[in-house]
């Protein structure tokens, strides 16, 4: 059973001003070798450092980066530029054809998009003529998965957990009922664009959420991945050119090959099943 925790806007840097260096983040630190920029492999842990630029000029963006993660295709090169925040027509078609969610459902796997959404948000995005969904949520709908409202028994808040450890443990318990579970955390990128002190709080909450997830001690393999940098440099409001972390922890971690790009993840996940 694989659990894909996507963290929007988490890059890597050696700058000592970064919250990745300033804050006490023991769980994230353990999963990433202290936010290292050097890959490592340990029992039950594979850590890789991924290029988010994809050979295309400009700052990496969410829609193209997430599409690359989910399809294994270089979405930015396909377009000739990076695209964000929401996937437009060409990327929508790619997600409909090749995303992990669509592929997994077609193979008969049990798949869950675990994010819980406010009812008013669901009404807005599902009633819009334009796509207002992220690549992860768009791919979920393309696969026929429901976008769950907050309060649904299988829905998980993507951030802002009142009790992060308990939320992480609950997420693990839900995920053990599925072959492939997705959760999209967008809080770091959101606050990273706003020069907000909330960013530190959200990083600590994410660390505690992961601690609760791992302490559940279930036979799950966690995949933690990001699409582009942002939160690691909170002294400005833009995305960064920095590489991003990929951490795989659990029974399947020993099967992770060398990976260097966002496009390397989806093909490996498909080979697992």
PLM segments and residue spans:
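Metal-dependent active-site segment of extracytoplasmic phospho-/sulfohydrolases and closely related
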Residues: 4-12, 202-239, 269
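Short, hydrophobic/amphipathic alpha-helical packing segments
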Residues: 94-101, 168, 203-214, 266
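His/Asp/Glu-rich, glycine-adjacent segments
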Residues: 59-61, 65-193
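Active-site-proximal segments of metal-dependent phosphoesterases and phosphodiesterases across multiple
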Residues: 190-208
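Active-site nucleophile/metal-coordination loop of metallo-enzymes that catalyze phosphate/sulfate
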Residues: 11-103, 119-129, 249-254, 258-262, ...
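Short active-site-adjacent structural elements
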Residues: 13-15, 191-192, 231-236, 255-256
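Residue-level preference for the first positions of well-ordered beta-strands
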Residues: 1-3, 178-182, 221
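Catalytic cores of processing enzymes, dominated by hydrolases/peptidases
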Residues: 138, 143-154, 217-251
């Amino acid at each position: 059973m694989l659990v894909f925790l996507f963290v929007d806007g988490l890059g890597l840097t050696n700058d000592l001003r970064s919250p990745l260096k300033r804050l006490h983040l023991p769980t994230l630190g353990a999963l990433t070798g202290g936010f290292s920029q050097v890959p490592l492999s340990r029992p039950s842990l594979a850590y890789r450092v991924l290029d988010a630029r994809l050979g295309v000029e400009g700052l990496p963006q969410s829609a193209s980066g997430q599409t690359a993660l989910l399809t294994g295709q270089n979405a930015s090169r396909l377009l000739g530029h990076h695209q964000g925040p929401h996937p437009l027509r060409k990327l929508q078609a790619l997600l409909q054809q090749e995303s992990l969610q669509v592929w997994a459902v077609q193979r008969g796997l049990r798949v869950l998009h675990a994010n819980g959404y406010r009812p008013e948000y669901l009404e807005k995005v599902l009633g819009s003529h334009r796509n207002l969904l992220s690549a992860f949520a768009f791919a979920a709908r393309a696969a026929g998965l429901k976008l769950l409202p907050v309060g649904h028994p299988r829905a998980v808040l993507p951030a802002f957990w009142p009790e992060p450890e308990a939320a992480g443990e609950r997420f693990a318990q839900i995920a053990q009922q599925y072959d492939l579970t997705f959760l999209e955390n967008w809080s770091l990128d959101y606050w990273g664009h706003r020069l907000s002190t909330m960013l530190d709080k959200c990083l600590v909450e994410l660390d505690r959420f992961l601690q609760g997830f791992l302490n559940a001690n279930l036979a799950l393999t966690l995949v933690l991945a990001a699409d582009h940098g942002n939160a690691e440099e909170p002294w400005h409001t833009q995305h960064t050119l920095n590489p991003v972390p990929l951490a795989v922890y659990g029974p399947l971690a020993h099967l992770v090959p060398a990976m260097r790009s966002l496009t390397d993840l989806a093909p490996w996940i498909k080979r697992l099943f």
